[in-house]
């Protein structure tokens, strides 16, 4: 049986809100400090991570660079926080039917560990993209891998 990878995670955080507004408009989205905590946790565990960048006007992102692919990571607030991971690269292998999601799985499992070990995070739930869209982030699963 092939393991199903859940790449969307929702969770709450007690870290301070770092969103900045001007004249009632968001000028800098919140979540930079939260993604920074996750980013640093991955780096401490040996992952090669890019710098964190603002993603459009609603979130923050960075990439994990591995030999076989890149994993793009985004956080945005959708009550609660939403973490999305997406595998980039390795298109030729996937077209040839050789799909290795082991790096992506390891990243999601490491996010699971980082969030579980940090008392400023709680209520972690995992979803596939389809599950998240269908349930609007309600329910979910305890682990990123089925």
Predicted regions and their residues:
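Amphipathic protein-protein interaction modules
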Residues: 61-115
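Intrinsically disordered, low-complexity regulatory regions enriched in serine/threonine/proline
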Residues: 100-146
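A short linear-motif detector with a strong N-terminal bias
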Residues: 28, 40-43, 51-53, 61-64, ...
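N-terminal low-complexity, intrinsically disordered segments
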Residues: 1-43, 47
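Solvent-exposed amphipathic alpha-helical surface segments
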Residues: 41, 45, 49, 92-93, ...
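Amphipathic, interaction-prone secondary-structure segments
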Residues: 32-36, 48-76
């Amino acid at each position: 049986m092939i393991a199903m990878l859940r790449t969307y995670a929702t969770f709450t955080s007690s870290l301070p809100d770092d969103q900045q507004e001007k004249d009632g408009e968001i000028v800098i989205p919140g979540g930079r400090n939260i993604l920074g905590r996750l980013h640093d946790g991955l780096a401490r565990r040996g992952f090669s991570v890019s710098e964190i960048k603002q993603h459009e006007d609603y979130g923050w992102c960075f990439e994990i660079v591995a030999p076989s692919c890149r994993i793009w990571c985004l956080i945005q607030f959708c009550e609660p926080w939403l973490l999305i991971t997406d595998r980039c690269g390795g298109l030729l292998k996937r077209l040839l039917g050789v799909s290795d999601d082991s790096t992506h799985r390891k990243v999601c499992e490491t996010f699971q560990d980082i969030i579980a070990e940090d008392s400023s995070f709680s209520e972690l739930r995992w979803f596939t993209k389809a599950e998240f869209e269908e349930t609007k982030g309600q329910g979910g699963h305890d682990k990123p891998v089925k």
